[in-house]
A protein has these predicted regions:
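Transmembrane alpha-helix boundary and packing residues in multipass membrane permease domains
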Residues: 27, 31, 43, 47, ...
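Transmembrane helical elements of multi-pass membrane transporters/channels
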Residues: 22-41, 143, 154, 177, ...
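Small-residue-rich hydrophobic transmembrane alpha-helices
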Residues: 54-114, 151-170, 277-341, 373-395
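Short runs within selected transmembrane alpha-helices of multi-pass transporters and secretion channels
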Residues: 75, 144-162, 173-181, 199-212, ...
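Residue-level hotspots within pore-lining transmembrane alpha-helices
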Residues: 29, 33, 37, 67-71, ...
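Helix-terminus/linker motif at the lipid-water interface of multi-pass membrane proteins
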Residues: 36-54, 124-131, 187-194, 256-287, ...
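N-terminal transmembrane alpha-helices
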Residues: 12-49, 62-77, 81, 106-113, ...
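Short alpha-helical transmembrane segments in multi-pass integral membrane proteins
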Residues: 1-24, 82-147, 191-246, 303-369, ...
Length: 449
């Protein structure tokens, strides 16, 4: 098992099913671990601080995610461009682009940190925080924003470590950051009883670990193809990276906007209890979705490299194998979600008996979306890897914003609270049709079918 996970594989190799799974597995484990650590954070808050505090954290979280979305954009878009450049044989240029993106990210992170703290109170009110939730939103948000730069770096380096053929290091970093978060959560929230401030402090200290380790690795001489150093200003490359990663940026922005809309609908239909139920579903959803995100992140540099090298035969094989792998994942995860609806709900709302049946029903309906979501995530990532930012962004924008907003606006009128939980199923079904149309329509241009 150790050899399967940690044997070094180069992007230029031919990928069998076994080799593809071996290369992407560290990214899958890394994303799942990241999600689990976030869930542990929420378990501490919901069980030890209370459901009102849990609802307040969930209310402000979309705003914090919007500010951190730039890290995902430059990470996925930049790594696709760097992988393409490496595949074309320009290692020096690839390193200059890599360095430029990291330095730009740090500068933007500083601006967003200052702006985020300045506008935190009015934004919390805008998101619907009442007088009870407002101070919790603000105190949690201010602390978390202090760790925005390392959070953005951590997200960016997750993609670049795969491009540097070091996905295992990304896994080690994630484990180190996650263990830090869990240990400090237990200390600050359970032992010292610092409440949501303790949870926020544990979060940012773990993000410093996650951002600092890869930063030091790339600043020092290393055996990978990437290293931070002097750079030239590649304006076109910077714009290209942003365009490539615009789908991931749009996904994070859209998810945050949609979460706000869900919270608004649930506050209207159920009050703060509805927001708490949605929070439970979202945290469990993060773990399941992380498997698809991890596979897409791990396979994207391979696609980008072989596209840059002009190897269309390998490109066709990668797409075919990936769709087969995602089909198996989708069926297994949907079955697991339906079987585990009750035990997973109990983890969060065991002390809230009135919320338990609502949470179980909501999760059972929501779980059907796992049949479609993997294909949509992969299709968007596939086009990002091909440096087609427009199609990638189109799929992401439609999936995470247009279809979801339409569904969560219309379906509750027809089915009341069940309509809220079914909205994501409807949105993912529509997105699957769009993804299929894009893959078929672009097959001759990119030569993958």
């Amino acid at each position: 098992a150790k050899d399967f996970l940690f044997m070094r594989i180069q992007l230029s190799e031919h990928f069998t099913y076994r080799k593809l799974l071996r290369f992407t597995l560290p990214s899958v484990i890394m994303m799942v671990c990241t999600s689990i650590y976030g869930v542990v954070d929420s378990v501490f808050v919901s069980n030890l601080v209370g459901s009102d505090a849990f609802a307040a954290v969930n209310l402000i979280m979309p705003f914090l995610m919007v500010l951190g979305a730039v890290g995902f954009m430059l990470g996925t878009g930049g790594s696709a461009l760097v992988a393409y450049t490496l595949g074309a044989g320009s290692e020096k240029c690839a390193n200059e682009i890599f360095s430029l993106l990291i330095y730009a990210l740090i500068g933007l992170g500083a601006v967003f940190t200052i702006g985020g703290i300045a506008f935190l109170t009015p934004v919390s009110r805008l998101l619907g925080a009442d007088e009870t939730m407002l101070p919790v939103c603000v105190s949690y948000g201010r602390i978390v924003l202090l760790g925005l730069i390392p959070y953005m770096l951590q997200n960016t380096f997750q993609s670049f470590l795969v491009t540097a053929e070091r996905p295992q290091l990304g896994l080690y970093v994630t484990i180190a950051a996650g263990v830090t978060n869990i240990v400090l959560d237990a200390l600050f929230v359970a032992v010292l009883q610092w409440g949501v401030e303790g949870a926020a402090l544990a979060t940012i200290l773990s993000q410093f670990v996650g951002g600092a380790i890869p930063l030091v690795y790339f600043l020092r001489p290393n055996s990978s193809k990437l290293r931070l150093g002097r750079t030239s200003f590649h304006g076109r490359a910077l714009l290209k990276a942003c365009a490539n990663g615009s789908s991931e940026f749009m996904t994070n922005i859209s998810m945050s906007v949609v979460n706000m809309l869900y919270n608004w609908q649930l506050m209207r239909l159920m009050g703060s209890g509805g927001v708490a139920v949605y929070g439970v579903i979202m945290y469990v959803n993060f773990i399941f979705i992380a498997i698809f995100l991890g596979y897409s992140m791990g396979s994207a540099p391979i696609v980008g490299y072989h596209y840059g090298a002009g190897n269309r035969t390998e490109l066709r094989g990668l797409l075919r194998k990936s769709l087969c792998i995602i089909t198996v994942m989708s069926v297994v995860l949907t079955a697991a979600a339906l079987l585990l609806a009750r035990p997973l709900s109990l983890i969060f709302v065991s002390k809230e008996p009135t919320l338990l049946p609502v949470t179980i029903r909501a999760f059972s309906i929501y779980s059907l979306s796992f049949l479609m979501v993997g294909y949509n995530i992969y299709a968007s990532s596939f086009f990002t890897a091909l440096n087609d930012g427009f199609i990638s962004a189109l799929i992401s924008f439609a999936r995470t914003l247009v279809f979801q907003v339409a569904a969560v606006t219309v379906l509750p009128v027809l089915w009341d609270i069940d309509g809220v939980w079914a909205a994501v199923v409807a949105a993912e079904t529509l997105a699957l049709l769009l993804s299929a149309a894009c893959l078929v329509g672009k097959r001759k241009k990119y030569g993958y079918a």
